[in-house]
Amino acid sequence: MASPAGTHSLPSYLDPNHLGPWGVYLQQVDRVTPYLGSLARWVETLKRPKRALIVDVPIEMDNGTIAHFEGYRVQHNLSRGPGKGGVRFHQDVTLSEVMALSAWMSIKNAAVNVPYGGAKGGIRVDPKKLSRSELERLTRRYTSEIGIIIGPSKDIPAPDVNTNAQVMAWMMDTYSQNVGATSTGVVTGKPVDLGGSLGRVEATGRGVFTVGCEAARLTGMAIEGARVAVQGFGNVGGTAGKLFAEAGAKVVAVQDHTGSIHNAKGLDVPALLAHVQQTGGVGGFAGADAMANDEFWGVACDILIPAALESQITQDNAGKIQAKMVIEGANGPTTPEADDILHDKGVLVVPDVIANAGGVTVSYFEWVQDFSSFFWTEEEINARLVRIMKEAFAGVWQVAQDNKVSLRTATFIVACKRMLHAREMRGLYP
C-alpha cells in the first residue's frame, strides 16, 4: 500500500528507535528540528544517508587461505561539497556505527564551515591479528571496492581508529594505480613525503585544547592549575593532555585499553607519552597509582576529555563525573541519556562535532595544499587551525546563549541550517 501524500516511508534501520549510534544521531536531529524554521521541511534529508555501500573484501592470507571481511563506505550528505571522513579498522564496526559517524562528519564539517559533506568508512576486522602484508592487501582491496564512489572531488577518506599514514599511502597508491595517474588528494592524513600536511597528527588534539580554552575563558575557569582527566592517550588524548599540561593544568588521571592511572599531584605528561610510545599503553607507568577502570569516571577533576571510542559516558557512569567541563575528543562518547544527566548536574559539555573538528580542518588544509602543490609551514597551519576553531566555537556559543540550549544542540542548529540552506539553494534534480 502506498504511503499517503506528504509522509515518508522509513526503512527499518532508519527508524528513530533504532538501537546503536545511528539511533543516537536521529534523536539529536529531532532535538534541533524545532529551531530550523522554514528549513525544517528539508530535515528528512538529514535522516537518511545519501548512499551506503557494503562491500565484500576478500584477501589471501599469509597461510594461503582466503578470508572475507565486510567493509562499508557511507556518504551521508553532499550538499556542501564532497564527502569527507575517516576509515576505521575494528572488529566491532557496524553499518549503524558508520552511518552515524558519517552523519556526525556532516555536522562537524558544516559546524566549522569547511566545504565538505560527511562520509565514513570501515572494515569489520581486528587489524592486530593481521600481518603487515595482510593489512596492506586488505587496505588495497577495500580501496578498490569503494573506488566507484571515492575521489578527490567526490569523497576523501582519512585515518581513523586503527588506521594511519601508512594505510592512507596504500589507499592513495591503489586509487592512483586504478585511475592511471597519481592522485594525492584522494585521501588525507598521508605521510608528509606523499603530500601530507604538517600538523595533521596533532590537529585533533590541538583543536580539543583550543575549544577547551575558549570554553574555560567564557565560563571563568582558569586553565592554570585545572585538574584534567583523559580517556584515551593516543594522537587525540595525548596531544590534548600535553597541551593542557604545557598551559599549566595538571593531568591527574588517564585511562586507555591497558588500564587506568592516577596521580592527584599531576602526571609527568612527557614521561607518560614516552612510556606509551615504548609499551603501547599507560598501564604500568611508574609515576602514578593504578586504579580500577570504573573508578576513573569519578576521579576529582575540573576537565574530563573522553578521547577513545563512542558511548563511553552512559547513564550508568554519568552521575559519578565530578568534572565541571567535558570536552569530547572522541566521536559520540556521550549517550543522549548521559547528556541529560550531565546537563542536570550543570556540567558543560563541549560536543565532539565542534571539539574534535581540528582533524578534519587540517585535512581540509592538506587537500587544498595537494590541489595547489604548494605547502604551508606548521606555524601557518596551526595559526589557521586555531583561528577557524575559535571562530566556529564563538558562533556556536552565541547560538547556545541566544536559544538557551546546550552547546551540542547549538552546534547541530548551526550545522543543520548550513546544510539545509545549501540543499534548498541547490534544489532537487531531476
PLM regions: where:
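N-terminal ligand-binding/catalytic initiation module
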Residues: 1-198, 421
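Rossmann-like adenosine-cofactor binding region
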Residues: 259-349
